[in-house]
Structure formats: structure tokens, C-alpha cells
């Protein structure tokens, strides 16, 4: 797995964001100077995905997973990356013991695969996603950093992501701009 793919995975895993809202829905979470707030923590558009994620009280599990997977340097790189960042509550929905098992050194490759499944190369905004979905007749395929596909669709004004196993996640906060990409917060963990 090359460094760009690992970086993408790290961003996705660390932020674990799922489900994108349209730009109208996300506007309440952004100040006039471009600073967004995730879990009450300021996310500065001049900082990297990792530099911002470590301050989010809602993404402690993701940050720990990105660290365990060895993806910090990748997601701190120039990118750009689109990270779908699951919250701590999203990780808590997984079966008991899953996170504890995944962060063990012997499961690093599996963890990297899951995290990079949450990363799409390039900067894909909520507006880009909704346009892709509209142009695709209600669905859009996104190729992730691990090479697998996510399917994006809309439910009202909320972007939904469907993983390879049929699991769904909603984007609960979209367009959290970073110096090396964009984060969209998710309410469920996606599985390749």
C-alpha cells in the first residue's frame, strides 16, 4: 500500500465521518472566517486533518485508530484528502471488543484497510457529492484510498454512504475544511 493510500485511510479512520449534509445544512457549523466546529472544538482551515482531529472530543477513537494504524504522517501530508470521519458514538455501535481488537499490532493491516476505506483521494465537498449523485441518477460511486467503492445517495438533504457490506452511514456534518482536504462527519463506521 503506497503512502498516499495509507494517508487517505488514516484520515478517513481518524475522522470517521459519515453522511454529508448539503451546504445549507452545514452552514450553521461554520463561522464567517471559515472555522468549523466539530464536537465544540474549532477546526481551522489552515491546519491539517490530523492537527484538527486531535482536538475533537467526538473523534478520540478515530484518532487512536489512525495512530495505531500508522497513518498519522500520511493524513498530515499535503493531500488533498476527503475523510469520512466516524464519531466515537459511531465506533461504539460496533460489536463489543471490535475496536480493542482492531488496534492491536497484529491487526494493523485490517485497521489500515478500514480506515483508508473512509478516505477518498482529492477534495470532495458536499456540493460535489450532491452533483455527482444527481448526475448519477440518484447514486454516485466513490473509489476510496484502499481501492474499494462507497456508494453515495441522498435521503432528503442528507448524504448517505453505503459500504461494501450494505451498511449505511449518514453525513451529520459536512465540509469541515482542512489545509490538506475536507472532513465529513459520519454517524456509523463503514466496512470494506
Report each predicted region and the residues it spans.
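C-terminal motif of bacterial Sec signal peptides marking the signal peptidase cleavage site
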Residues: 16-19
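Mature, structured domains of secreted/extracytosolic soluble proteins
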Residues: 2-7, 21-192
